[in-house]
Every structure is written in structure tokens, then in C-alpha cells.
Amino acid sequence: MISKLTKIVATISDLRCEPEHIKDLHDAGVNVIRLNTAHQSHEDTIKVIDNVRKISNKIALMIDTKGPEVRTANIENPIIVKTGDKVIISTSPINEPNNFQTNYDGFVKEVPQGSKVLIDDGELEMTVVAKLPDRLICEIKNDGQIKNKKSINTPGISLKLQSVTEKDKGFIELAAKYNVDFIAHSFVRHSKDVQDVQEILTASGNPDVKIISKIENQEGIDNIEEIAKASYGIMVARGDMGVEIPAEDVPIAQLKITQTCIKYGIPVITATQMLHTMIENPRPTRAEVSDIANAILNGTDAIMLSGETAYGKYPIEAVKMMTSIAKKVEKHRKMTLYKDELFYDKSITRNYIIKCAIDATKLMDIKAIIVDSLKGKTARIMATYRASVPLFITTNSERLARELALSYGVYSNLVDNNFKRTTEFVVTSLKMLKEQGVVNDKDTVIIISGNPNRNIEKGTEFMEINTVEDAIKGRNI
């Protein structure tokens, strides 16, 4: 049975990746497993990939790159600072107190006087009060300490960092080699960043790995339209985003990004600290529950767990909680959130049929929508309407089934054969759904398909509304 329409992405590490644990996560509602390469080696990653595939060929895999970042460097002992103190960020070590460098050679050159500099995910704030050719002199704004290899953010400042690091390149090549489904690339600022990742995948012999662009700063937000056009999907990565832009601007950015993804018919993932309390506690805060609910009400395809499942004390409970919240919210949302003209281009038959099917779900008691989607495009566009009934595709492509694991309300059944005629597809699909207990003979379903000869790829061409029993009998096979 299908318990929810919203998809769940869960982060796991090699420290807790036994097949039994992965199965428990999957049974609790996880659709996609995420691997954070910031904390893993190639060997660790391969171990997790192998274990996931032992459990199910329908669980999608996502490798998350570390991306370009600036960190503190050459600090032997923590620098203790108080409000009003001065520190020096220099291009190379100098004989001055409170001095440190960064791992990015262009930092001093590219950061102007007056800029805000944040250390360790925003824990320490300083302002550049003077600039010399080889150093920035900064004034501390709050008490704290500066440790080695801590993150540095410069809100509103565009640094000329390379889009793909050597470490990223190695993991992208690994994703291509092991046929991973998604690459989530960090700190995407322009469509060119997406193209850079695609070039590595193509050169590695697997251009079909799908790219999820992580939006984490103002540049990415400003360029969301061009990034969405170039990407398979988008992740709203609210951790670094909440450091790079004012915290009160994050909900507005989240909504803008979600609406842009809906506009272009691509999946969107809402991420970071969704059930952060459950890393240490068995129950979430009311604010966390509301955060998840609002993400779903705003139209997200998927919601993500990070530390909650990677190293938290209650990983299965966190997934079950997320599933429970999703099920409840989905029952109380409007049938569809979006305008009637969404994807309503009458020159494209597919879009007209999709719109008719969505309208039918509002007026009739429809149990399920069965979509004959050879490449997934029709299913992804239908998902964008966020209908209140699940969409099912039957396919012999494991890759397609896993790609659709990110799309709202879309579920896949895998078969061995490649249907030659639509009749075979419909009958097989309905019989499988009956066996799974999703539908019974008297339930009404919508069937969407293309040319009766499935070898002729002409796209979506017809819609049928029928009971399961009559749809099978009418095909007489």
C-alpha cells in the first residue's frame, strides 16, 4: 500500500549502513538514500551503495558533493577573541597576533572593505575594516574563538571559486562508474556549474546520472530560473543558506525556489534541520513539525533528513515521524495548489490530457492514475500538479523507477518485459496494483498512455476513466 505522496530522502553513513538498517528505513518511508561525501571516503561510499542495492532496486541513491568552500587555515591553537578585537586574514603567515589564512588564495583580493565575514557556520561575526594588498583587518562583533578548518562565509560577496573541486570530481566519476541515480552538487550559483558536472559525467561514460542543484547562497537564489532549466531537480539547502542570507529571508527564498521548480516541472527537495531535535530526543518540537507541514503545503516533492538518520539516536523514529506528518498534511491540503493554466499549452497534446486527468480527480472518486510514461516526462509533469491520488508507472527500467523516486506521488512497479502494446501495459499494471492491494475491481482509475503500438514514440495521446474490472475485461487478454 502507498502510505504517503511526499517523498523522503535520508542521509546515511558507513558507520550505520547495514542492510537490515536500510530495510528498516525503507519500510518506514524512505525513498532516496543520500551519501554526504564531506564525511566519507570512496571505499565508504561503495560499501553503502552495495548495501542499498541488496535491499531494493527501487531505492534511489544520491551522492552529495562537498562543493567549493572557504575554510580557515594555519591555526595551531584556537584564537580566543572578544567583541571589538582586531584579527588579520592574510595571504600568507605573518608575524602578527590573531593572524590566520584561508584555503582560498583569492580571498584577500576578492573580499572588499566593509564586508561581513562569518566563521564556523555564522557562530563568529567580523567586519572588514581595512584592506591592504596582502591582508584584511577585521573587527570582531561577538565573543568567540577561531579554530582551524572552520567554514568561512561572506554574505553578498561573489567569490571566484571553481565550481567543481578535485574531490568533487572524484566522487562524480565514482557516481558514474557505479550508476548512482543522482548527484547533488553543492553551492550551485549559475547554470554553468551544472554544465561542469554534466561534462564530467559524460566524460566518465554515464551522462544519465541526474544532477540536483543545491541552492545555498544569494547568487543561487538570484539565478534560480537558469539553474532550474539546466538541472534535473533542486535542493533547498537551508543550512548554508541561513548563513549566507538573513535567517528571516530563508522562508521566502524556500517558497520562491519551490514555485520555480513547479513552474519548470522538476523535483524540489526541502532540506536541513527538519527534525534536528530528534538527533538526541525521541520527539520533535512543534516548530519542526510545522516546518515539515509548511514545506509540503508549499508544494515540495521531497523532504530530507541529515544528521537525524546519519548519526542520530532515533533514525527510524525520525522517518516514521516524517511519514506521519506527511500523511496527515496531505489529507488536509487542497486538491491542487496551482493555477489552471499550469503546463496548459494546447499545442501539446500531452499537457491537455494531463490537465483533463487532474480535473477529473477533483470531480470523481479516483483511486489511482496509471501512467504509461516511457521516459518519465508525463509522470513528472503530472506530479507537479500535486494531485491527491498516487500515480503509478510500470516499467522495465530500474533507472527510470529510481529517478521517479523523487517525484511527488509517483510510484513505480518493475517488470522484466518491455511491453509492445499499450493493452499489455494496462492489464499488467492493473493486475499488479490489485495484487498489492492498492485497487480492487470496483475502483475507478485514470489510464494515460500513448500510441497503442508502444514501439512508436509519439508521446501521450489518450486518457481513459474506467473501473479496474472493466478496463481489464475490455482489453480481453
Curated annotation (Swiss-Prot):
InterPro entries (UniProt xref): Pyr_Knase, Pyrv/PenolPyrv_kinase-like_dom, Pyrv_kinase-like_dom_sf, Pyrv_Knase-like_insert_dom_sf, Pyrv_Knase_AS, Pyrv_Knase_brl, Pyrv_Knase_C, Pyrv_Knase_C_sf
SUPFAM superfamilies, alphabetized: Phosphoenolpyruvate/pyruvate domain (SSF51621), PK beta-barrel domain-like (SSF50800), PK C-terminal domain-like (SSF52935)
First-tier enzyme category under EC: transferase
GO molecular function, one term: ATP binding
Alphabetized Pfam families for the sequence: PK, PK_C
Annotated positions binding Mg(2+): E216, D240
Entry GO terms, CC: cytosol
Binding residues for ATP: N36, T37, A38, H39, R71, K150
Cofactor: Mg(2+); K(+)
Residues binding substrate, per UniProt: R34, G239, D240, T272
Catalytic activity: pyruvate + ATP = phosphoenolpyruvate + ADP + H(+)
EC number of the protein: 2.7.1.40
Pathway assigned in UniProt: Carbohydrate degradation; glycolysis; pyruvate from D-glyceraldehyde 3-phosphate: step 5/5
Marked site: Transition state stabilizer: K214
Ligand binding (K(+)): N36, D64, T65
UniProt subunit comment: Homotetramer.
Family: Belongs to the pyruvate kinase family.
Annotated protein name in UniProt: Pyruvate kinase
Organism expressing this protein natively: Borreliella burgdorferi (strain ATCC 35210 / DSM 4680 / CIP 102532 / B31) (Borrelia burgdorferi)
